[in-house]
Amino acid sequence: MSNERLRDSMLRNGLTPTSISEKIGVDPKTVERWITQDRIPYPKHRHAIAAMVREGESYLWPNAYSAARTAAVAQSEVVTMYPRRSAVPGELWRRLLDNASMQIGILVYGGLFLHELIPDLTATLIKKANEGAQVDVLLGDPNSQHVAQRGADEGIGDSMAAKVRNALKFYEPMRGHDSACVGYHDTILYNSIYRFDDEMLVNTHLYGHHAAHAPVLHLRRLAGGDLFDTYAASFQRVRAKSWEVWPDE
């Protein structure tokens, strides 16, 4: 049985068995066996490869840890929990954004509050993209039934769709940027996800409550844990179904 997750992650990052072997000091044939025979590398090699391909160890080698150990590590991935989004310190949002250098992901319906917290958000996202980070902003399709339903559930009606359209105006400067994608999605959001490299804020959603009044998890990815990776995988699934707001630019 082959490790297709490892193979795909290497291809997406332009890596080969030879290039990886040179970086971590093993024989290329050893790397080949990790792929074709699903052999599990030593912990130090798993950590190095995961960093190279920007994936979690638990995603690349799900059988490397026992269920008990994975559960224990996952608990440590929770840095803290806030009772509501409005309790998350503004400086935390700023720090996470400023420190991110590889991957920034925003999955929301509107997320208009971000531009109030961080007035230079769009300019910072463009700067990060120019420096090599992958930036993905996924907004709810303002014409979708899910956005309409969320507006009804929160008692604000059409205002939810209006929030999406207003948020989109802030992202206009990102039009046509290769590494900064602004897309629409048509999914039911059980959580809004804000990813900054290996840290993440997850705004849970509660029926009948505004997102600002719902709890937030602050997560930090750890080797051997799978909680962060579970939310990261959910983000990627939505991203795969999304479409660009400005596809021809």
PLM region descriptions:
Residues 69-146, 229-237, 244:
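PLD-like (HKD) phosphodiesterase/transphosphatidyltransferase domain
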Residues 180-219:
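HKD (HxKxxxxD) catalytic microenvironment of the phospholipase D
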Residues 18, 29, 58:
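Key DNA-contact positions within bacterial/archaeal DNA-binding proteins
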